[in-house]
Regions:
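N-terminal helical cap/lid subdomain that shapes the substrate entry/recognition surface
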Residues: 2-11, 15-103, 110, 114-115
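A structural preference for short, pocket-lining loop segments at secondary-structure junctions
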Residues: 117-119
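Asp-based, Mg2+/Mn2+-dependent phosphohydrolase catalytic module
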Residues: 2-3, 110, 126-254
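Conserved phosphate-coupling serine/threonine residues in phosphotransfer and NTP-handling enzymes
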Residues: 14, 123-125
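Non-catalytic, surface-exposed connector residues within folded enzymatic/regulatory domains
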Residues: 21, 39, 74, 99, ...
């Protein structure tokens, strides 16, 4: 078995609670600016999260929930692009100094940097949104902490397809067995598994009841020394928080 050489993180819901606290409010603010009377409730947004990608989510919503909506110039593609650009503007404003990292994320990232374990991101989120979050929640140079940021439309098909993970692996010049993925959702788990990656799940309010069959671990968070995680599935031995030692143990398991 090869050594653990890289951690590949999802972003939304994994690094931070951005789905609940930034993306959904940003969509609703974009709808207001566009003069639309749409509002995505917490419950509805949970359903829409089954669709990977913001633009794809808007398109699905229009087709499934607003089928009688008069699309400007009958150009759905351009309507979706424009609305998503407005949403991204609001997202960037919302994350500045407002969205903290989830427990254990900064500690694990810093430990990986110290020990020479490479860091990458694999997400359906727009690259500008990822950059805004990393700069605000990690450090002004946060994006540079990650050797590869595979995001948004860099790949043709989004999660649950494996394309974004395959892109990250190729950019790292690593094999799946060299890496561990950290995700928060069923869709993300399917993508990572299809790319051949062992995966750790940290659930959130939107995803805690999803099917995580095949994950190495399912946790409520990565935890901290003074804020132990809750193990929902898997074997952590005596560990009370997720660190590189535990990551390496999982990586070595057959």
């Amino acid at each position: 078995m090869s050594e653990l050489r890289a951690l590949i993180f999802d972003v939304d819901g994994t690094l931070a609670e951005t789905e609940r606290d930034a993306h959904r409010p940003a969509f609703n603010q974009a709808f207001l600016e566009a003069g639309l009377d749409w509002e995505w409730s917490v419950e509805l947004y949970g359903e829409l999260l089954e669709i990977g990608g913001g633009k794809e989510r808007i398109r699905h919503y229009v087709q499934q929930y607003q089928s009688d909506f008069p699309i400007p110039n009958q150009d759905l593609d351009q309507f979706v692009i424009t609305l998503h650009e407005i949403k991204n503007k609001y997202f960037g404003q919302l994350v500045v100094d407002r969205i903290p990292l989830r427990p254990g994320v900064m500690r694990l990232i810093q430990e990986a940097k110290r020990e020479g374990v490479r860091l990458a991101i694999a997400t359906t989120s727009d690259p500008h949104n990822v950059e805004a979050l990393l700069k605000s929640a990690i450090a002004p140079d946060g994006p540079s902490w990650f050797e590869v940021i595979a995001a948004g439309d860099m790949v043709r098909v989004k999660k649950p397809e494996p394309d974004v993970y395959q892109y990250a692996l190729q950019a790292l010049s690593l094999q799946p067995e060299d890496c561990l993925a950290i995700e928060d959702s069923h869709q993300g788990l399917l993508a990572a598994q299809a790319a051949g990656l062992k995966t750790v799940i940290t659930v959130n309010n939107y995803t805690r009841n999803q099917d995580f069959s095949g994950a190495e671990l399912v946790l409520n968070s990565l935890g901290e020394p003074d804020e132990p995680f809750t193990v929902l599935s898997g074997n952590v031995g005596e560990a009370t928080y997720f660190d590189l030692a535990l990551a390496r143990q999982l990586h070595q398991r057959g």
